[in-house]
Amino acid sequence: MALEAYGYDLRPEYLEALMLMGNGASIVKEDEEHPLVFFDNGMPDLSISHVLEVLGFDYEEYYLGEGQAVDLDLIRRKLKALLANGPVVLGPLDMGHLTYNPNHTHLYGVDHFVSVYDLDDDYLYLHDPAGFACMKIQFEDFLPAWQAQAIDYKRGAYSMWGNFNRVASPDASAIYLATSQIMAQRYLQGQEGVLPLYAAAVAKYGLNDEQKQLHQYFSFKLAAVRNLYLSRFLAEHDSLRSKIKEDLASLFGQAHLSCLKEDYEDLSHLLLEIAELDEQFRTLCLEARDC
């Protein structure tokens, strides 16, 4: 939404694919019986910066690093300054604090991004790509979501991106090569063996309420979409990796249904199939990096 307002015609599903957030898996909360697992191996805020750079954009960004003192007046002034040039992307936000979403109580600790288009003395005005346009929220009420205290996989709090200016126009081949390198790097830096361990835990212990809320309302359906978008992006460059991603999208869709039915035996089997395909994809990503 923000880039479109600046006059850049880039489809949301294309940008989502380039964020590369549907690969691998990460344990975000350790627990022998009920670990909390996200189906990605990257940080979403860093992914936004990567996408902008890969596509040839110059931009301004701000975030408050760990241990830095919080100065809300400074943060507000920074946002106001960026808004003078156009909409600003904010996030990661904790969806549990976005009260305009009727499902927000099921989404604490889940990251999200929005496009802010105005700020006055009391209110923030934003478009949420989850289907909530023209939302008006008191600035003070928005701060807990923006602080994202429950989201560990981020560079910092109060992150924002704005003042977008495309200074280069890399061709499709250059974009593919850059994203391919990022995929390999994330696999090398990410956690390994998460999915087989998770499959075993699900088979033995099932899912607790926290896991069910995450998976039923968010993670499986999002993983399916992310894998499908990446499959489409890869189709003209690497047919094998594209097919694996298409198959993974189908498996994540089936996992969503098994999760809703609370059929944990079937869900465990699906997670093992996902693990096998993701490992194949990982191997191909590392091989492509070395070519």
Model-derived features: positions:
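Predominantly the structural core of cysteine protease catalytic domains
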Residues: 45-95, 159-174
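Short, hydrophobic/amphipathic alpha-helical patches that form generic packing surfaces
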Residues: 1-5, 222-232
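Charged, long alpha-helical assembly modules
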Residues: 227-291
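Noncatalytic regulatory segments and standalone regulatory/sensor domains
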Residues: 121-225
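Cysteine-nucleophile protease catalytic domains, especially the papain-like/related folds used
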Residues: 1-72
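Catalytic nucleophile-His microenvironment captured as a short glycine-rich beta-strand/loop
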Residues: 104-131
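Short, solvent-exposed loop/turn segments at secondary-structure junctions
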Residues: 97-101
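A short, structured loop/turn motif at beta-sheet edges
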Residues: 82-85, 117-123, 240
